[in-house]
Amino acid sequence: MDRVYQLSLIVHIFSAIVLVGSMFFNVAILTPALNRIPPAQSAAVADKVGAGLRVAGPASLLLLGLTGFMRLYDLGVLGVFFTVDFLTDSWKLAVPLWLMFISWLLLAITGTLSAIWYEKVLARKLPYSAGLRDLEERRAAQEKISGYQERLNLVNTTLGGLAALGGALFSSGLLN
């Protein structure tokens, strides 16, 4: 059984690297590059590159949740993790673990919002019967949602960085 928990730690760390790395790539490299090219080309590139990110993000979030709770069980704190006593009595252990948990939970929420916005507004195609007015309304809605999406990407990247900080604090033992 010890091998299972060692493997879960490896999967947990790898998933964190994939998630945080893809978020930093999106914010620091992809978005600025897309803003420098014409909108039609930008949309095509974003759709192709984004397809991989839309798989990597949810998959790594799911793996982080699964392996995170397995790690809590392995540490023997899963039963008391959601109690006030754990936060007050074991705060040196609780702070980095809760930082990771809250970041993960918020990333799951914002990731779901991003997916809904993408599917409902950004990726939806207009019908063939659409006129110029429909096209302009669609473009305005896409521009508005794209602005929200860019801000949400910054929030997600910050949350990913905080979760990584929690993991680093926990594994380094700096708070002990």
Residue ranges and their predicted role:
Residues 1-176:
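Polytopic transmembrane helical bundles with strong interfacial aromatic enrichment
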